[in-house]
Amino acid sequence: MSAPDDLLRVSAERLLVAIRDILAEKSIVSPAEIADRIAITEAASPAQGGGIVARAWVDPLFRQRLLGDGTRAVEELGVVMRGAPPLGVVENDGSVHHLVVCTLCSCYPRAVLGYPPFWFKSASYRARAVRDPRGLLAEWGTIVPAGVKLRIVDSTADYRWMVLPRRPEGTDGWDEERLASIVTAGDMIGVTIPKIA
């Protein structure tokens, strides 16, 4: 890192500490609440989302609850949703394939998937997901057959979306851990589908 980069990093850290101190001083939020929120955010990851998908694949009752009220269902698995927008879950099947996009910015289900991939926030992805979704998916190697409806789901500041992908053929008898290992962030956004290695 260069000296200007170091200076910028130090300045940003000082600003962050100052904001945190002001929020605590005004009793808006305590340092413990800030630390708690940071821990929750850092615990979220695509692996956590993969575990949610795997549970839905092996437990039909959980799958029903997940599709009915995603927020409540993921909380059953220990995912902390406090302070996060509600979570909706849509299911890919033989007749419909869902693709999640935030057309305005980068609203992403961070509570279950962690930080968004860089491309999810890009203007190119956001525009093409709406204008040319089949072309966009083809670039990811995901071909949605002509007979399958492609539904674009707009994730917003008020409501976040996640895709429950189709379980791949040939995974009968797999346990949850093995199933979770094949699920990627792209699968839960709808740009890719789970593949058996």
Predicted segment positions?
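Terminal, compositionally biased segments used for targeting/anchoring and flexible tails
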Residues: 1-197
